[in-house]
Amino acid sequence: MPTKLPIPIEFRLPESWLPARPEGFDAVGVAFAAVHPRPDAGFAANITIDGEEPPASVTLADLANEPVERLRDVAESVEMAHRREVGSVDAPALTQRLAFTSVVDGTRRDLVQSQVYLSLSDIEDPHRHAVIRLVLTATAAQHDAVLGDFQDFVRTVRPDTETEA
């Protein structure tokens, strides 16, 4: 069952990506998932969205460390290949790329995750902040081919300006 995000967002999926049911070890807390229509050797690249309202004292780097530790519990040779703080003072963000080996459906796979952490303010209550995490997971062989789609997707994510009645 998908989890509700702490603040509503809107986004546009890349062309041909398909909404999917969140599954797997890291699906707890996932609000939305999508899969690439062309799997690589049986593994479908996927995009997931989750989020939380962290205490003010928690940094984006603190939040980004958590999935690294979770991956180390279930995967082999987890390596942080890249981490960079981006955005502005008013809208900070953090990107990181993780490479790891994991057994998925009985097959050992070299996977790469590109993660983006966006700090967003609630449109209706600007004092309320949430961090939205966007994650692309793909095989090492397919990652670079789908990364552009993920980057295009990230550019469409913003707080939802239409309120529910």
Please state what every model-predicted region is:
Residues A34, I49, Q96-L98, Y117, ...:
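Short beta-strand element of the conserved SAM-dependent methyltransferase core
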Residues E15-W17, A130-A165:
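Surface-exposed amphipathic alpha-helical segments
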Residues E52, A99-V103, T137-T139, D160:
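Solvent-exposed residues in well-ordered beta-strands and their adjoining turns
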Residues P19, R83-E85, P159:
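Hydrophobic/anchoring residues in structured secondary elements
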Residues F43-T48, P92-T95, H127-V135:
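Glycine-rich, often proline-containing surface loops adjacent to acidic residues and nearby aromatics
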Residues P55-V58, D105, A141-A145:
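A generic structural signal for short coil/turn motifs at secondary-structure boundaries
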Residues D62-D125, Q151, E164-A165:
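Signature of long, low-cysteine stretches enriched in small and polar/charged residues
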Residues M1-E69:
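Secretory pathway targeting signatures of secreted, lumenal, and periplasmic proteins
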